[in-house]
């Protein structure tokens, strides 16, 4: 199938864009390419993450349905414990709901968005996820 366009990035609403951009920069690297009071744009390996201020922002209540999660971000890693510890040290918090902690670790970023570290698609991930 021919794509209509290239995927450029994802945008997350939050109360404090600079803080959230710096959190994700600690998680994935990259460079902050644009910053204003309302929007910060981080580029990681050609993929953009924008963080835009929403004064009425409310963190998702996942897995409870009160405030939907809207989106979440997955990171691939071969070191779940190390990745999780680094995220917690950078300001993330662990989700009490961990559906499959041997493969996925669910956390919340400082603004409350859920995100995961996973071995899925790596050499140590589940057999079904490995590239042939």
Predicted region positions:
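Short beta->alpha transition motifs characteristic of CBS
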Residues: 53, 98, 106, 117-124
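Core segments of cupin and vicinal oxygen chelate
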Residues: 1-5, 11-55, 83, 89, ...
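Short intrinsically disordered coil segments
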Residues: 65-68, 89-93, 132
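N-terminal beta-strand motif that seeds the catalytic metal site of vicinal oxygen chelate
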Residues: 1-21, 27, 70-77, 118-132
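A short, acidic/glycine-rich surface segment
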Residues: 56-62, 125
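Vicinal oxygen chelate
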Residues: 6-15, 43, 60-82, 103-108
């Amino acid at each position: 199938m021919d794509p209509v366009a290239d995927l450029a990035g994802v945008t997350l609403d939050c109360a404090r864009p600079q803080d959230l951009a710096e959190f994700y920069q600690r998680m994935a690297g990259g460079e902050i390419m644009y910053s204003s009071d309302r929007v910060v744009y981080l580029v990681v390996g050609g993929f953009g993450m924008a963080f835009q201020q929403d004064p009425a922002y409310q963190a998702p209540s996942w897995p409870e349905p009160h405030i939907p999660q809207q989106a979440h971000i997955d990171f691939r890693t071969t070191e779940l414990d190390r990745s999780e510890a680094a995220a917690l040290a950078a300001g993330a918090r662990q989700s009490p709901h961990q559906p499959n902690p041997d493969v996925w670790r669910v956390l919340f970023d400082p603004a409350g968005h859920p995100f995961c570290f996973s071995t899925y698609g790596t050499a140590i991930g589940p057999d079904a996820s490995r590239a042939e």
